[in-house]
């Protein structure tokens, strides 16, 4: 049984899903970028409680590759701060390297119920 404090933390938890779509001709460069730059950026994020960096498998993707970064924050305010500051920095770095070719989709997730 989860403690009351832990349950409150899960209710306040705020999640952000970032999906990066890379065209087929840039997959090798993107994979290298993930290993050399993106992983380091994510490791150094101050307000991110936990994260999962994943390759997305889907029958819907026929060209290119999708990568997802799922970020967990303590609360909505920390997520908003991330979007206003860190997300802009990450986006600018990716655009400097790949231009408009790598598309970034952000999705805010607000847990209603969970079972961790």
Stretches with model-predicted labels:
Residues 14-21, 54-86:
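Short, well-ordered beta-strand segments in beta-rich or mixed alpha/beta enzyme
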Residues 6-13, 42-45:
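Short, surface-exposed loop and linker segments with low hydrophobicity and enrichment for Pro/Ser/Thr
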Residues 6, 10, 50-65, 92-116:
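Glycine-rich beta-strand-turn "strand-cap" elements at beta-sheet edges
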Residues 24-26, 75-77, 113:
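Residues that cap or initiate secondary-structure elements
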Residues 44-49, 72-106:
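An amphipathic, aromatic/His-enriched active-site/gating alpha helix that lines ligand/cofactor pockets
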Residues 26-53, 89-92:
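Short amphipathic alpha-helical segments
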């Amino acid at each position: 049984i989860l403690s009351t404090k832990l349950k409150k933390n899960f209710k306040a938890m705020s999640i952000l899903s970032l999906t990066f779509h890379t065209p087929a001709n840039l997959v090798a460069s993107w994979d290298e970028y993930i290993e050399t730059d993106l992983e380091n950026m994510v490791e150094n994020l101050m307000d991110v409680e936990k994260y999962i960096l994943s390759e997305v498998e889907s029958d819907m993707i026929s060209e290119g590759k999708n990568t997802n970064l799922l970020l967990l924050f303590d609360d909505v305010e920390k997520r908003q701060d991330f979007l206003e500051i860190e997300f802009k920095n990450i986006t600018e770095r990716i655009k400097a390297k790949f231009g408009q070719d790598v598309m970034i989709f952000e999705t805010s997730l607000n847990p209603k119920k969970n079972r961790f």
